[in-house]
Amino acid sequence: LMEHAADPDTLVHEWAESVIGDQYPVPDRILHFTELIVQDYLAQEMCDRRPPKGTFDLFATEGGTAAMCYVFDSLQENFLLNQGDSIALMIPVFTPYIEIPELRRYQFDVTEISADQMTPDGLHTWQYKDEDIDKLKNPQIKALFITNPSNPPSYALSKETTERIINIVKNDNPNLMIITDDVYGTFIPHFRSLMAELPHNTLCVYSFSKYFGATGWRTAVIALHEDNIYDKMIARLSEEQKAILNKRYSSLDLHPEKMKFIDRMVADSRQIALNHTAGLSLPQQMQMSLFSAFALLDKEDRYKAKMQEIIHRRLHALWDNTGFTLVEDPLRAGYYSEIDMLVWAKKFYGDDFVAYLQKTYNPLDVVFRLANETSLVLLNGGGFAGPKWSVRCLLYTSPSPRDVEESR
């Protein structure tokens, strides 16, 4: 904060009020010093310490799930996405990204882009084919929703796929809105979000829950570059649509037409009328500041290295007993592991057994039998629009034998 020439008295006043929690958040979008700290944190963790020019405006939210709700709501309220519009969804993906577009309010026409690339020996790479990414060239597709690294495969976009998306935006679909959920980015060495590569098109949702093991704190931010296509597209709406929006936000600003999209999200999150009580609670913002400051002061990234080492240790503890060789992949976060049971069945028992398995059993039989007989709870990958016979294993909360031994 001293690098930002912060006034010490003003800083201490904000922090003292945040600890006490005696006020509504002012500014409502995010507290002043919280925004400065989190901006630096995102530049370090989401942009690999090489942020694009300009500033990202932040909106502090009650976890990533609230951020998702606010994004979908405000995109529609501001006519950026209308009922029945075409969007693209990169799958497998966190289930609500599948279910929300299906709601009657939205009923979006969804183009699924599946991470179905395979190695020559039949293993999943969880990356995307060029011809599928090229679907984004269609200007009818207004928005792309992505979780990066993915959930549940837990892989980051390859450099080739990222560059292909960049070229498509620059040459074919310049108004493509990209909504990226990057909660697992800190588990990838030198991770760079699409917010770093395509800042004008990308709206980033980042939650502190996974990296800091603090899901119960409900701390997240929506990040949107100060120079973005969302504001520009609102400015190009029809006169009728502008009139509707001006009336909607007229109680908040003498010139509602000048309101930024991210500020409209804040107001929308409280049905406009309760905008004066909007924002994440002061204690939650204080905790968010502490998380960010902790990472920023860890100049050698010791915490990050330890978290990544724990994940990889557990990943190998899982896979070393499967009969498969887990090839090292710098794009693998490892927070989850998605295991395709049909790949296993084919490798060890052949095609005839695969056919028998599919004919005789249901994919859910695997997870229910594991739960009943071993008390091991996994999720079926089909619910994430992944392979029907895959299962998702959560490694971050699944201690390896070494973890148990070290805890004694």
What do the predicted segments below correspond to?
Residues M195-K260:
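Active-site PLP attachment segment
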Residues A243-I310, L315-L318:
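Structural motif of enzymes handling amino- and sulfur-group chemistry
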Residues E3-H4, G21-V26, M118-Q127, P153-K159, ...:
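Short, flexible/disordered intra-domain loops and linkers
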Residues Q287, F294, D301-W319, L326-V354:
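Conserved glycine-rich beta-strand-loop-beta hairpin in the small C-terminal domain of fold type I
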Residues E328-Y335, I339, Y356-R392:
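Conserved PLP cofactor-binding pocket of PLP-dependent enzymes
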Residues A5-N173, G185-P199, L203:
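Conserved core of the PLP fold type I
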